[in-house]
């Protein structure tokens, strides 16, 4: 009798631990001198509104004029915030880097209520596990996340986003910074034209 066929198995946690040679692609678009940083929580309705305007802002401003840096602002009252932020960071380590991370954010934004809790404390997601959230995001985004999510020291990138926000005194989402200064006069309710008017000429 011939040998049993080899079954491709997922790497063990020890194998993943031995290979932590990973890099999170910075969530940066454009390369202009004006730096527009936006701190977003992926399931926050106001963050979702702001996220939906970033492409239009970059198109209108031009990649030669503006650099957009997306910062992840996890918030504990959005109950699966930590899991979803880790999914976004995990996506950024994949071959397509920030494009995969953006696809994950767009998928969550498009189905935001399926990743939230009713009044932050109830609803169907009480029965959902972190693995269920990962699979749901994979289904909507087409991005395979589970293996990258399991990178043991992936939290160092998640912590960087947290520390960066804290050192800048940022606690809410969305928050906007232009050239290193918080702009309290900017909000998700503004039009792209309003944002453009607040950028340096």
Regions found by a protein language model. Name each.
Residues 7-17, 33, 113-124:
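Short N-terminal helix-initiation segments at or just after the protein's N-terminus
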Residues 33, 84-85, 142:
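Residue-level signal for cytosolic alpha-helical hairpin/rod architecture
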Residues 4-5, 11-18, 24, 38-59, ...:
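C-terminal cap of thioredoxin/glutaredoxin-like
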Residues 31, 74, 91, 144-145:
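A general structural-boundary detector
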Residues 37-42, 48-131:
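Structural alpha/beta surface segment adjacent to cysteine/selenocysteine redox centers
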Residues 23-32:
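Short beta-strand-to-loop junctions in surface cap/lid or active-site-entrance loops
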Residues 31-33, 65, 173:
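A general structural motif
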